[in-house]
Amino acid sequence: MTELEKIGLIPRSIVRMLDRFYYQIYLGTAEPLVKQFRFSKYLLLTSVKSLFVVLFIPFFINIFTKIYVFRPLVEYFWDRKQTEIFLNYELQEKAFSEIRNFEEKMYFDYLIKTENFFPEKPKYFLPEAPLPGELPMQKKELFGVNLQEYKFKSNHSCLKFYSTEANSSVFGFENGNSLKLSHVSLFASKYPIKFTVIKNDLFKIKNQEGKSGAFPASEEEKKLKKGEKALLFPLLPTFSFSPRKNSSFFLGEKENMGISPGSKEEKKLKFFFFPHSGGTFSHCSLGIEDSEGKFSPGRREISPLLPGEHCGKLGKNAIFLLEEEKNGSGETRASFATSGSKAPALEELKNQSIDFLIPLEKSSPQRTFFSQHLASDFCSFDLTAQTKFHFVSFPNSIDTVPYNFNKNTESIFRQKTRELANHYNNESISAITNLLADFMGLFILLFLLVNMKMSLMNTTAFLSESFFSLKDSKKAFLMLLFTDLLVGFHSPRGWEVIFHFLFEHFGLPENHNIIFLLVGTFPVLLDALFKYWIFRHLNRHSPATVATFQAMVE
């Protein structure tokens, strides 16, 4: 039935049946059928051609203009005419999130790959009653556990000191007295290794080659007022040589060495040796500057505790540790200083006081960590109070830069940052390019729709005829599938994904309120239009299809 059929007294179904009967008995039946076939063929070809032109021509023009026209123009103006990298706030947040994730991944990988970074409770072995002179034989056990250094995100390094006391001359053991680990002190420093020069003290060192020198002051330190703090060198690797794995210090202190008791020059002298590449000092003299500025050497040559085999002449690289008790509180102030071939010109340092080690607070996370992993019951001993030995070790050779994984970390992080900057800069350029190219494609589509009215009418007629030629059950199934996909119960999730993609595609800020508003209104509009089409057109042309569709919905 068509809209042009007239309504008469005889039902139209009877008229159509009579017409079909007339065509079947008419001798020229083939000619109308051929004409109908040719018209259907023409309608099919025209529809395919129209659909191809309307769909693919705008698409190809969109791709071409995006690559060869808009992309170069946008890159030129975006990279050269302004300095922004991110087109909107969401791109910036994504970049920062990736940087944070990359930093956490680097830190995680570093903890996994670094051996003994957070070791368990240290294992050490010391015989209870060593024979005289056996201390050099125990250096491996001593040096392996004496100082542990740990890194925390709070920019702190933690040092653990073990102290021993022995009844002897400076390095020898006499009377066969026992030696055990004694008291333990935990210290933290905001920077791993700094230096302190004790007030009014000027320590000098004299190596076996006869060269001596004091610790130098920088130009900045010379400008400081009395009592101000100064920093000689910021980190341990800035020494003329840096500690290697399993390298250790030996520290000793001797009261009244070469100074008569009761004099104003009476002081405790601190000294130690740094085994490096299997060697130590052969001999070393220590002394103190008197009130007249003269260097007063000790009365005896000090022999090193450690054996001298494979010892290089490392006297030029001697290092001190100065130690002083603070106001009788039991808190220790420690410092490092150095003189060597790479040190600046020698200058006197006076009236300078720079503390770098501070006792850990009881509630600090570093102290909690030590108490959980490193606490032990240490035995004490008391031979005499005149000679003390302190052992400090770097067994794991961890970098002394706070929260620094390795030498390549900064370059790797910088490279990743540049990669992210380039990536999101290209994302911004792509978003602007997509917007311009899609507008061009839309303009071409509208132009074709206006100039191809007849072809599009034929296409519409062909599609309508194809749809209505189906059985009622098939038509109802297609209609149900279409409505459930676009306006069904689960469709809001799909529309949300589509709108998120469109916002990202065009570089628009993803406002969730706007997206939820579109998801809540656009499917409702489509549902209303679809129901109007069913009521206005489909109910007139195919009532059986409408009845089947309603039955399937129910």
UniProtKB/Swiss-Prot annotation:
GO MF entry, a single one: antiporter activity
The keyword Chloroplast is assigned to this record: yes
Gene Ontology process terms (BP): potassium ion transport
Keywords: Antiport, Chloroplast, Hydrogen ion transport, Ion transport, Membrane, Plastid, Plastid inner membrane, Potassium, Potassium transport, Transmembrane, Transmembrane helix, Transport
Record-level GO cellular component terms: chloroplast inner membrane
Family annotation (HAMAP family): CemA_PxcA
Biological role: Contributes to K(+)/H(+) antiport activity by supporting proton efflux to control proton extrusion and homeostasis in chloroplasts in a light-dependent manner to modulate photosynthesis. Prevents excessive induction of non-photochemical quenching (NPQ) under continuous-light conditions. Indirectly promotes efficient inorganic carbon uptake into chloroplasts.
Protein name: Potassium/proton antiporter CemA
Source organism of this protein record: Stigeoclonium helveticum (Green alga)
Gene: cemA
